[in-house]
Amino acid sequence: MRHKININNHIEIFDTDKVAKQAAGAVLMQEKNAVVLATVAREEKMVEEDFLPLTVQYIEKAYAAGKIPGGYVKRETKPGDSETLSARIIDRSLRPLFPKGYAYPTQIVVMVLSADPEVDLQVMSLNAASVALYLSDIPIKAPVCGVRIGRINNEFVLNPSNSELKNSTLDLYVAGVKDELLMIEMRALSNKKDNQHCMNELSEDDTLKALDFASSAILRGSNEYEKAFAAYRKNSKLEFKIESDNIQIIDYIKNTYITKLKIAINQMAKSERASEILQIAKEIESESMAIENEWKFEDIEKALHVCKRELVRNQIINENKRADGRGLKDVRKIDIETNILPSAHGSCLFTRGQTQALVVATLGNDNDAQMSDMLTEKNPICEKFMVNYNFPGFSVGEASPIKAPGRRELGHGNLAKRALYPSVDADYIHTIRLVSEILESNGSSSMATVCGGALALRAAGVKSEKLVAGVAMGLVFEEEKYAILTDIMGLEDHDGDMDFKVAGSHDGITALQMDIKLGGIEQKVLQEALYQAKEARGYILNLMQEACEKIIVNEAILPKVEIFNVDPNKIPDIIGQGGKTIKDIIEKFEVNIDLDRDKGEVKIAGIDHNLISQSKEYILNLLHSKGSNKRRDKKEMPKFDIGEEFLGRVQKVVEFGVFVELKEGVDGLLHNSKIKEKLEVGHEIKVKVAEIKNGKVSLDLA
């Protein structure tokens, strides 16, 4: 059945019960020329483990844009970074909808079958997946709606096209259901004004206005989807895990082990991997009370976690005190060291409590930029600013193998990139790669990456517009009471109701990410959280500024760049036949050379400034000598008059005519169309000058 919905500046067409009918839920969605297929499939048997076994995959098919995959393997292989990040957005938006006790392995797959350069595939894919999930037999309360908000000429724009987004100073992606916001991703988009770089940070008040604008659109969209598809939902006959209330065990813990549990919580505040809970569970299991009542070990563990959560939250709500002794607004102790790696271009060891990030900046040339194929772009996208985030197991005390970056690492690196990128001028001459090695982790490692990254840039001599800092905020909500936490640690992230990361300068927000576990959040609470984050950000920025003033940039190891312009027509002279000339220059002077054929721009990069200057002088002398030779050749060429006759000798026979020698070393072309008899090399023939153009002589028969 086909459903046509006109909502939020989009005309969306949904085909249900047409394709993938074996899946639990499926929908084919079209917007303009873009078509996506979203499917939901689940297993019949529940898993034993206590977690939601949900997998989300987002796949862009090359044929959707009329392309054949590049490389040796001409088919889609593992997903690219952009596909992984899109899958994360869908996952974070839909995961909160699943009912408590749902434990069926579930897979949501979104495939882009046809692309349109103007259609936002992220928004479209989330909405298609939401409808497919709503149509399935998984009992979610209502469909999610995702929207993107831009800001053009200081006006908020709902669901801007891809070309409109290029003129926007804001990129805000929000997902929610009805009047509840579930997921937020925001970034400031820098640009040029009067040839000046502008970061375009968003103020806290403007951020709230943008979220309010998005909330209205989400409510409309969620209601429209519910209205259109409620009658076509599958009946749910699923059973859910019945959680044991473990009241007897909980009471026993509170009466007997509360002191030990408080000590354990204090230890857990210092490490994400503290094993104190496990030790207490083993101790209880061995007691006669547990043996007589046949308490299962997993039930004891669950009861301990219930008590632990209750203790942590009550202490925060009722005493305004946290597990590590901090107040609600306190930031953990910060230590900063810069340029601790002698051979690296720039480095910063940023430590906040038990979270530590070593962030290293490397400067390169244009050839070092990351080239990425984008489905809706004809040419690869060139990224000159990269952030890589690594999270080894030892950072939380685990002996796990180091593997390729996973979804979490890609997501954290992308968040740090969005936070820092506006501070760097897009015209900056170097390619920049930041690598964050998380050496310790107890919450907020992505925000430590932002802080360390901003300082590593300065340590590498990058003149960023402003320093950028980040802080992770948390929320604990109990009935009518709530508490907002600054600089949350792992324990508070796990037992809290909101994960809210805010990064920016003194003047506003450059990036924001929020995942809400409890459903809707009131505007006043969000406002309070934003301003509390601003206060913490200001405190951290002041410490970072003090560290900046002590930075000693190692100029000797930094790459230098010389840029100059030449006649674009002379660029081939620099390249030489088969690239021989430019290769010789690069090898001789130990430099890298980038050429812009359209602008005639020559960019020389290297470590030694003298060698760069010498290579520049060499190139200019080369072009000067080439020009002199051409002028001399032009000067020495005999002068001919139109109609002047010669008795010439055929020097060369080619496919399109013959070359006839007029004077020593000077030939003219007699085209086939003007030849009346077969001519061979050595034949004499009488010709006359017909035309002279660009130093070339065309002949006629005399």
Swiss-Prot record:
It is found in: Cytoplasm. PROSITE patterns: KH_TYPE_1 (PS50084), S1 (PS50126). Keywords: Cytoplasm, Magnesium, Metal-binding, Nucleotidyltransferase, RNA-binding, Transferase. GO terms for cellular component: cytosol. Residues 643-702 form the S1 motif domain. InterPro entries: ExoRNase_PH_dom1, ExoRNase_PH_dom2, ExoRNase_PH_dom2_sf, KH_dom, KH_dom_type_1, KH_dom_type_1_sf, NA-bd_OB-fold, PNPase. It is an enzyme of class 2 (transferase). One of its GO terms (molecular function) is 3'-5'-RNA exonuclease activity. The keyword Nucleotidyltransferase applies. GO terms for biological process: mRNA catabolic process; RNA processing. It catalyses: RNA(n+1) + phosphate = RNA(n) + a ribonucleoside 5'-diphosphate. The keyword Chloroplast does not apply. Pfam families: KH_1, PNPase, RNase_PH, RNase_PH_C, S1. Residues 559-619 form the KH domain. Mg(2+) binds at D493, D499. Its EC number is 2.7.7.8. Signal peptide: none annotated. Its cofactor is Mg(2+). It comes from the Bacteria. Involved in mRNA degradation. Catalyzes the phosphorolysis of single-stranded polyribonucleotides processively in the 3'- to 5'-direction. Belongs to the polyribonucleotide nucleotidyltransferase family. HAMAP family: PNPase. This is Polyribonucleotide nucleotidyltransferase. It comes from Campylobacter lari (strain RM2100 / D67 / ATCC BAA-1060). The lineage of its organism: Bacteria, Pseudomonadati, Campylobacterota, Epsilonproteobacteria, Campylobacterales.
